[in-house]
């Protein structure tokens, strides 16, 4: 099912990477049900980071799930994946079905972020950790409030922006993480929560 897909084969980036917008892939009822479930049943906790040597606890909440107890380190903090939740697995399968026709991907983990309102965002960063490998594919699904998602090129500083809606899927591919940073922009006009699921493929550990 693809309820709204502008042109999923089009690249939202002008160069040095690929970002495809698959549009809203869930019905309004499905998206509402998933949002309610995720808010109530995911093991949310406040994110932690080490920035300039200081330990920071963020207002934004996170959760990390996977097929194995993957260790994932970013912003100076290590995390261990929880076992797959059945509803997360269902969402993952629907995302993989969207990608299957052109570029089949099998994801084995999911990092979730919960933003209570527009006062919470995500600073500029790239998902370029070694455990994800080179030219990794990351699928991002949004539930809840519409939020502005921005990209900024690491060298040229050129920007691209997209408003991510309830039930929308975008996919980052190729050299995107090597050349672009991305962020969730804050807004004082948003008073409802947003949950973002980023499905990833972790490399074998050991």
What kind of region is each of these model predictions?
Residues 1-206:
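Non-heme Fe(II) oxygenase metal-center motifs and adjacent flexible, charged/small-residue loops
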């Amino acid at each position: 099912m693809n309820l709204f897909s502008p042109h999923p084969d089009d690249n939202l980036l002008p160069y040095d990477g690929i970002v495809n917008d698959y549009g809203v892939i869930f019905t309004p009822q499905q998206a509402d049900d998933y949002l309610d479930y995720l808010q109530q049943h995911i093991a949310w906790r406040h994110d932690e980071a080490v920035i300039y040597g200081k330990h920071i606890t963020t207002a934004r909440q996170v959760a990390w799930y996977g097929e194995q107890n993957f260790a994932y380190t970013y912003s100076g903090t290590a995390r261990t994946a929880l076992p797959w939740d059945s509803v997360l697995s269902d969402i993952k399968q629907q995302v993989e079905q969207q990608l299957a026709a052109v570029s089949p991907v099998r994801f084995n983990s999911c990092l979730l972020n919960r933003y209570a309102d527009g006062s919470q965002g995500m600073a500029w960063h790239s998902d370029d950790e070694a455990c994800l490998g080179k030219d990794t594919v990351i699928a991002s699904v949004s539930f809840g409030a519409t939020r502005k998602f921005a990209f900024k090129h690491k060298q040229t500083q050129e920007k691209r922006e997209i408003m991510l809606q309830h039930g929308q899927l975008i996919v980052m591919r190729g050299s995107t993480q090597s050349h672009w940073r991305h962020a969730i922009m804050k807004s004082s006009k948003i008073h409802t929560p947003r949950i973002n699921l980023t499905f990833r493929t972790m490399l074998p550990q050991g």
